[in-house]
A protein has these predicted regions:
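Short, amphipathic C-terminal "tail helix"
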Residues: 75-126
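Gly/Pro-rich interdomain helix-loop hinge
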Residues: 1-76, 118-119, 124
Length: 126
């Protein structure tokens, strides 16, 4: 989700005025700086922040994927469209810096299930 939000050319921005232009990458870089994570540029700092978060998740016992929690693939895929719709309709979604398209939410769920990383150019088009 951090990589998704940090896009410098999102398909759709969030609805609040503070999201009138992409600046999330720079904000994540500020967090990395505050934590002393290093990096030569904002993208490198973002990757260092993600690495630190993943290390913390491992330390506290959060599994890497939805699949790792024993969720059956068939059941997951059967419920995927409903989960996407509920996530899209959730009141908090509009407060996200980057407002996701339903196809993007679906891809994020699939990535979370299979343990894939977000890559901007691999995101499905609406």
């Amino acid at each position: 989700v951090l990589r998704f939000n940090a896009s410098e050319a999102p398909a759709k921005m969030g609805t609040f005025s503070q999201y009138d232009h992409p600046h999330t990458l720079a904000r994540y870089a500020e967090i990395a700086d505050f934590l002393g994570l290093g990096g030569k540029n904002d993208k490198e700092k973002l990757e260092n922040l993600i690495k630190a978060i993943n290390e913390l998740k491992e330390t506290v016992g959060i599994k890497k994927t939805i699949k790792d929690y024993g969720v059956d693939e068939k059941v997951f895929l059967e419920n995927l469209d409903e989960m996407v719709e509920q996530a899209f309709d959730d009141q908090c979604t509009g407060a996200n810096p980057r407002y996701p398209l339903m196809s993007e939410i679906k891809q994020m769920y699939l990535n979370a299930y299979y343990g894939k990383h977000f890559v901007e150019n691999e995101m499905p088009k609406a």
